[in-house]
């Protein structure tokens, strides 16, 4: 399993809750992440959405968690509670060169959210943006259901 492998390869990793005081560390990490990924329109839209979420972190009552190794943020996840049953995992970023980082931040963030909001029943992991690898990863979590996504222009 990816998490077990990550723990073996990175025994000194830590988690840290994202706060307004350390949010800049996530901004710095995601900037580095975008530097090594090929630009496309979806990436640009995601980048804008993440920037807005950072700007309004407190106002929209977001939660976040970072994975840290040797003082460096190697992954983070952020989301917000939708209602008493649903939680929306809005963003998850990790360095893909670090085996298991995505699986580990997913697991640790899910555990944090389950502890903070024990009444929750569903985590919305959002859509796969048409990326086959992301779809495969999200389907590996055996979702309860998949919803159709629609765009509306006003």
Describe these PLM feature segments.
Residues 1-39:
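Acyltransferase donor/substrate-recognition loop-hinge adjacent to the catalytic core
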Residues 2, 29, 49-53, 108-109, ...:
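Short, hydrophobic/aromatic alpha-helical segments in well-folded domains
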Residues 5, 32, 56, 112-116:
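A generic secondary-structure signal
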Residues 7, 55-58, 139:
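Alpha-helix boundary recognition
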Residues 10, 58-60, 117-118:
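A structural signal for short coil/turn segments at secondary-structure junctions
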Residues 20-27, 44, 128, 132:
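An alpha-helix initiation/capping motif
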Residues 25-73:
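Short, conserved active-site entrance elements at the starts or edges of catalytic domains
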Residues 63-154:
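Aromatic (often tryptophan-rich) hydrophobic motifs at membrane interfaces
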């Amino acid at each position: 399993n990816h998490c077990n492998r990550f723990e073996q390869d990175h025994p000194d990793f830590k988690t840290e809750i994202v706060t307004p005081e350390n949010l800049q560390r996530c901004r710095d990490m995601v900037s580095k992440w975008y530097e090594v990924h090929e630009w496309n329109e979806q990436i640009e839209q995601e980048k804008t959405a993440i920037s807005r979420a950072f700007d309004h972190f407190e106002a929209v009552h977001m939660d976040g968690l970072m994975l840290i190794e040797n003082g460096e943020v190697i992954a983070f996840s952020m989301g917000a509670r939708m209602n008493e049953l649903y939680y929306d995992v809005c963003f998850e970023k990790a360095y893909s060169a670090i085996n298991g980082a995505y699986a580990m931040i997913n697991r640790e963030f899910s555990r944090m959210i389950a502890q903070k909001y024990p009444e929750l029943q569903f985590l919305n992991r959002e859509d796969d943006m048409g990326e086959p690898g992301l779809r495969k990863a999200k389907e590996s979590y055996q979702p309860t259901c998949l919803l159709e996504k629609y765009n509306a222009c006003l």
